[in-house]
Amino acid sequence: MTSQLHKKGEAWSARFSEPMSELVKRYTSSVFFDKRLALVDIAGSLAHANMLAAQKIISADDLAAIERGMAQIKGEIERGEFEWQLDLEDVHLNIEARLTALIGDAGKRLHTGRSRNDQVATDIRLWLRGEIDRIGGLLNDLRGALIDLAEQNADTIMPGFTHLQVAQPVTFGHHLLAYVEMFSRDAERMRDCRTRVNRLPLGAAALAGTSYPIDRHAVAKSLGFDGICANSLDAVSDRDFAIEFTAAAALVMTHVSRFSEELVLWMSPRVGFIDIADRFCTGSSIMPQKKNPDVPELARGKTGRVNGHLMALLTLMKGQPLAYNKDNQEDKEPLFDTVDTVADTLRIFAEMVAGITVKPDAMRAAALQGFSTATDLADYLVKRGLPFRDAHEAVAHAVKICDDRGIDLADLTLDEMKRELPNVAQLIGDDVFDYLTLEGSVASRNHPGGTAPDQVRAAAQAARAALGK
């Protein structure tokens, strides 16, 4: 009977009086997307088999046969020779059926003391743990590229913006290091998420545990888990670890999207702060002159894709009673695509950032517009005893006058400045123009976290040192 069931692929079919329809088979099968879990499924099965043998639940001969068969199956999968079958429903039954075909009854004993419920939960955690580590490395690569570019531009002055209006001068290096901070927090979130992913569900079986004398801690140790899931119902039924990862991934993409928006803006001919290497751009099928920043534009769009996956997983879980439900089969495609999208995006962005051409003259010209040193003039007056609100009002008046005349504050002569600001004329000296230069403005922000070039260089060094931790 069992052999026939394995041949048919329906490990549960003895309970039913008619076979599943072909349409339902296609509808319920997951093998053509969950087969990417195959290698971690094999790793989990080998750890389980070793534990079963150590606990005298299966024989040493069975274990040797299982290890031999799994080695062959792993090779077939890696060479692309493994034949995946829709009738076998999922990655687990495909591998088990092939194992049984290779080694006979020993293959049928592998599933002793476990269910596909705890098996798949283990597979996902094993796989996701590896992907979190990979994404952490890719975040480091992007941070490193940003730090390199920031160090090269510690003295490059550009306008800082609020409300997309010129606000105060900053250095381009300081601006880039803001994204280093964001991606550093993303890396921290990934590491923190990993601690909750790295718990072993195996041993929970279907939902209640198993009557066999298993050793869950031994399996956890052999697979590199930090410990076991403490409750069997929770172990098989919840996917909060996948949701948490996807939320962290959505934040990664949100930061990428913000950076992308600025890259698109900076590359626009009307701004012209940077150029992106040709290999990251496309042209137009009708307009010969076009060079379009497709990579950052697509990254903005793909952020919505990852956000959608987060909502899909949250919605998937919100109405499920304990314990396992078939709904959970729908966790894999959003999770897989999130990993692929984030990993591809980070890898491309690290390469793209390294190839950015900076245009300092355009940045400086933009910083000279929009009265970006107005706050410096107000600070100058405050340091001479004027209350800040009064200084703010006086400088706002001066800005209005200059705006009407189409000139900058620095274009006023000392006499003109005193004449236009009679209430504070006695506070204004020849040194006022030192405060109205772009270099003087950024140099004055010489404190940790400030935009002064020396602080930017120090922050870049600290950020680089943090990459090694």
Swiss-Prot record:
Keyword Transcription: no
GO biological process, one term: arginine biosynthetic process via ornithine
Pathway recorded for this protein: Amino-acid biosynthesis; L-arginine biosynthesis; L-arginine from L-ornithine and carbamoyl phosphate: step 3/3
Gene Ontology terms: cellular component: cytosol
Database matches in CDD domains: Argininosuccinate_lyase
Pfam short name (any one): ASL_C2
Keyword Calcium: no
Top EC category: lyase
Keywords: Amino-acid biosynthesis, Arginine biosynthesis, Cytoplasm, Lyase
EC number: 4.3.2.1
SUPFAM superfamilies: L-aspartase-like
GO molecular function: argininosuccinate lyase activity
Name the UniProt record assigns to this protein: Argininosuccinate lyase
